[in-house]
């Protein structure tokens, strides 16, 4: 809970921000915390519908090693799995995922390609020994995706 008084306070402030956001991205646990005082135990689809009822155009819900799904305001759903790497640490992946996804979005890519790029960057981050110093640039991420697809096939991360 860091510097928050309690989880209810976190839920209040997270939900205030989420109601105004165009893009909401977080782990299932973060969504559960945000929605705690609204309705507990929502499914991913219910969460996406809730936030898109306010302002969100894209809702991305991450499930760690199980992958992630993006829900768009036009009713589309895109899912991705993580690239198979040997994780050296349990931190840094979320930052890599978020920056990779947003990079693709601002490049005008399709949502599934943004998910793939974010997933690749997250996988690259958790297999490294440190955090922000290891954040790969776009060329390195593209090379990683190409290399992984050559080894495992085109659909390696796509569901």
Residue ranges of predicted features:
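Conserved beta-alpha-beta core of the PfkB/ribokinase-like small-molecule kinase fold
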Residues: 1-46, 66-67
